[in-house]
Curated annotation (Swiss-Prot):
Entry's family note: Belongs to the phenylalanyl-tRNA synthetase beta subunit family. Type 1 subfamily.
Binding residue positions for Mg(2+): D467, D473, E476, E477
Keyword set includes 4Fe-4S: no
Matches recorded under SMART domains: B3_4, B5, FDX-ACB
Stated name of the protein: Phenylalanine--tRNA ligase beta subunit
Natural source organism: Mycobacterium tuberculosis (strain ATCC 25618 / H37Rv)
Lineage, opening ranks: Bacteria, Bacillati, Actinomycetota, Actinomycetes, Mycobacteriales
GO molecular function, one term: tRNA binding
tRNA-binding domain residues: 44-155
Entries under Gene3D superfamilies matching the protein: 3.30.56.10, Bira Bifunctional Protein, Domain 2 (3.30.930.10), Ferrodoxin-fold anticodon-binding domain (3.30.70.380), Nucleic acid-binding proteins (2.40.50.140), Phenylalanyl-trna Synthetase, Chain B, domain 3 (3.50.40.10)
Length: 831
């Protein structure tokens, strides 16, 4: 949000005459009380002659690819300057800002007289962006009539000695998206009296003699308040004054017409969005309801938008008048000939506004405020302020009628529920002995009503602070306003014996091992892409299709929480490949969400007491399983090309090796068995077992899945359930034999469908305790071996703990291993 320093200072000074601080000090104060200042933008600076001019004549120059105009500009005392300009948004008689030769504009751009398009250009007519007044550079800055006389100092008229603060307002502090809210914060920070610009003393109530317009509201829409007031007989030719246009411009809003400008101005001033309808274009009764299936509406930007049944609308008897809290509709738009206006101020459901504006891709200043909640107590005050301002600017008469729907039954007290808190709670939490009365004083400053009952405070938060719900929220306010810098920095003692759990240690070890093996870790999104399981071809009853839906998702097309990590990894793989990174190895360690038959939604439990054991048991039973998974994907070359050769493409064996890396890091033994499990290739997929428990799958992905998902050919993947892998106890240090090892190789021919792991297990069982290690280093197939046969060559390492082995000892163990393999898997020693 952007706000000018001069406007903030003016509102704060109403309650503290003479108050004045520098913009730099104000920036530090805002940061100190918890508001992030993204940027401080000084207007200008300009150096040299910048003046106000009136366009006396315009000559259109032809023969060029774009519009070019030679303008005669009166800069005072009938001094005319010819200036060449490419903008077309001004006419003869308009007041403009002219930078004369010798002037230096923001960015160090110096103006000089020059020849352009065959004419002499003696200066430049400036846009708002060129003067650092805003980002709009689509046309030059046109001042409203009466803003100044030709020859007046441009810097003074524009107020270029001002500063604009660009703040990032957090979602829980919607009240600060206004001058009213930020001025109150500054008054608290400086211990000043604050005069609320929405109070009766500043906005005297207008008379009410009857309802302004017939209205019906569907209670289920979540609307809390809906107010209407007409302004009759405004001048369609009226223009907003420069002081108002300037403030809108500095806040990033373009001025259009008085009816729209005053609603935007009051929104910035008081924080309450409003909308202006053309009263003469409304047909019959206004109503608030949900959109119907298939219904559409043409919004103010001229686009017809398809609505959802969750969208809340303002409608009349003929058409949609607005999408509630998001944008008005074209049917009741205020136009150039509008004379009667119906002003509307409503309080919409924040979740509904957020959902609608995201789905329609219609972010707006009003929606940003409604998402963060708006003060319902000032709806009529904001409406009266807007109506009075519009009548002052554009003439007309404020109708003495008002429609103010406040729910059924009507609500008269908009304050959140009161909170009880011990007076010393902030002191105990902060470890600071605040002066007596500090807590009550600070809470009163933020607008709360505070009453004492011995050592207990009863605090009723103000209507604009729905975020204050429990004592901890009140403590935060006291600590923030007193200054976080006074809280002592004390490092909490770490109790002996505490540290990472076995599961945390294992996850770190696995991540480190995969990273050292060439994998790059990503943080996966917890949501499933739409239709991913259809791309994989999963059966309708596949357990991975049983997902948990989020009611208010970050993305409308991704409401389901992930039951597997692979979709997120495969999306990251596709993005990397599309950007030229074709040799990719990624992994992720994260939770997945797997609902059960008992998973269900439960109501909120009150936070003012400890939950009962039954309530805790109910909550635990309602939660879905959330096991930790580890997953990896590989594509491209696993071994890079170079002088040694063309490189080795990724294959299923690399996925199996990733399983072994994870197993070694987990200190468990795994067994790989052939399996058929989508999205893996049925002939190149292994099911991973620890003991007799299945913990996941690995291998090459199915060619059809690869093609439909746009993945590189031969993509491989692994996914294991870490929670299904037991955390082993710390391994004792092994006894290291001081005797040398004996190395021998053995080649065994087996049927092509026999897993290499089964052969290795048979060899290990036959060789006995002398076999220290076995490693497969060659697989050979060909006519020499026979059809449907393969040759597996293993490197064997023998060692005894108590003596030096002879070749005969090793050969005997090797022969026993061959015999065992022959008996178990039908292996034949290759000659």
């Amino acid at each position: 949000m952007r706000l000018p320093y001069s406007w903030l200072r003016e509102v704060v000074a109403v309650g503290a005459s003479g108050w004045d601080v520098t913009p730099g000090e104000l920036e530090q104060t805002l940061l100190r009380i918890g508001h992030e200042v993204e940027e401080v933008i000084p207007l200008g600076p300009v150096d040299g002659p910048v003046t106000v001019g009136r366009v006396a004549d315009i000559e259109e120059l032809t023969g060029y690819k774009k519009p070019i105009r030679a303008c005669a500009v009166d800069i005072g005392d009938r001094q005319y300057r010819e200036i060449i300009c490419g903008a077309t948004n001004f006419a003869v008689g308009d007041l403009v800002v002219v930078a004369l030769p010798g002037a230096t504009l923001p960015g160090g751009f110096t103006i000089s007289a020059r020849k352009a398009y065959g004419r002499n250009s003696d200066g430049m007519i400036c846009s708002a962006a060129e003067l650092n007044l805003g980002a709009d550079h689509s046309g030059i800055l046109v001042l409203p009539p009466g803003a100044a006389e030709p020859g007046a100092d441009g810097a003074g008229v524009l107020g270029l000695d001002d500063v604009v603060f660009h703040l990032a307002i957090t979602p829980d502090r919607g009240y600060c998206m206004s001058v009213r809210g930020l001025a109150r914060e500054l008054a608290c920070a400086y211990d000043l009296d604050f005069v609320d610009p929405a109070s009766n003393s500043r906005v005297p109530p207008l008379p009410i003699e009857g309802p302004a317009w017939p209205l019906t509201v569907q209670p289920e829409t979540g609307v809390r308040r809906f107010a209407l007031r007409p302004v009759i007989g405004i001048d369609p030719a009226a223009v907003s004054p420069w002081w108002l246009q300037r403030r809108l411009l500095l806040c990033g809003i373009r001025a259009t017409c008085p009816a729209v400008d005053v609603t935007n101005y009051v929104m910035l001033e008081l924080g309450h969005p409003m909308h202006a309808h053309d009263r003469n274009r409304i047909s019959g009764t206004l109503g608030v309801r949900f959109a119907r299936s298939g219904e559409t509406a043409v919004t103010l930007d001229g686009i017809e938008r398809k609505l959802d049944t969750a969208d809340v609308l303002i409608v009349d008897d003929a058409a949609t008048a607005a999408i509630g809290g998001v944008m008005g509709a074209a049917s009741t738009e205020v136009r150039a000939d509008s004379t009667d206006v119906l002003l509307e101020a409503a309080i919409w459901d924040p979740a509904a506004v957020s959902r609608t504006q995201r789905r329609l891709h219609l972010p707006s200043e009003a929606a940003r405020r409604y998402e963060r909640t708006v003060d319902p107590a000032i709806s009529v005050a904001a409406l009266d302020r807007c109506a009075r301002l519009l009548a002052d600017i554009a003439g007309g008469e404020v109708s003495p009628t008002l429609t103010d729907w406040r729910g059924d039954p009507p609500c008269d007290d908009w304050s959140p529920p009161p909170i009880r808190m011990g007076v010393d709670v902030p002191d105990r939490i902060a470890g600071v002995a605040y002066p007596q009365g500090t807590t009550a004083r600070r809470l009163a400053q933020i607008g709360a009503v505070v009453t004492h009952d011995g050592d207990t405070l009863t605090v009723t938060p103000p209507s604009w602070r729905p975020d204050l719900r429990q004592p901890a929220d009140l403590v935060e306010e006291v600590l923030r306003l007193e200054g976080l810098e006074v809280i002592p920095s004390v490092l909490p003692p770490a109790p002996a014996g505490r540290g990472l759990t076995a599961g945390q240690q294992r996850r770190r070890t696995i991540g480190r091992s995969l990273a050292l093996s060439g994998y790059v870790e990503i943080l996966p999104t917890p949501f499933l892409p739409a239709g991913v399981f259809d791309l994989w071809g999963l059966e309708a009853d596949d357990s991975r299709r049983m997902t948990t839906r989020v009611l208010n998702p970050l993305e409308a097309d991704r409401p389901q929480l992930a039951t597997t990590l692979l979709p997120a990894l495969l999306e990251a793989l596709v993005r990397n490949v599309s950007r030229g990174l074709v040799d990719v190895a990624l992994f992720a360690i994260a939770q997945v969400v797997q609902p059960t038959e008992q998973t269900r939604g439960v109501g909120l439990i009150p936070v003012d007491r400890r939950p009962t054991d039954d309530e805790i048991a109910m909550l635990d039973a309602s939660l879905p399983r959330q096991p930790q998974h580890v997953a990896a994907v590989l594509a491209g070359l696993r071994e890079p090309r170079g002088p040694w050769g063309p490189g080795r493409p990724v294959e299923a064996a690399d996925a199996f090796e990733a399983v072994r890396i994870i197993a070694r890091a987990s200190r468990v033994d795994v067994t790989l068995r052939p399996a058929q499990y989508l999205p893996w290739h049925p002939g190149r997929c292994a099911q991973v077992f620890v003991g007799e428990s299945s913990v996941g799958h690995a291998g090459q992905l199915h060619p059809a899945v690869i093609e439909r998902s746009g993945l590189p050919k031969g993509t491989c993947a692994v996914e294991l359930n870490l929670d299904a892998i037991p955390c082993s106890a710390p391994l004792p240090a092994p006894r290291v034999s001081p005797y040398p090892a004996v190395f021998q190789d053995v080649s065994l021919v087996v049927a092509a469908d026999i897993p290499a792991q089964a052969v290795a297990d048979a060899v290990r069982a036959g060789a006995g305790d002398l076999l220290e290690d076995i490693a497969l280093f060659d697989v050979f197939t060909g006519p020499q071996i026979g059809e449907h046969r393969k040759s597996l060559t293993f490197a064997l390492r023998f060692r005894a703990p108590d003596r030096t082995l002879t070749e005969d000892d090793a050969s005997a163990a090797r022969d026993a291993a061959v015999q065992s393999a022959a008996e178990r898997v039908g292996a034949v020693l290759r000659g």
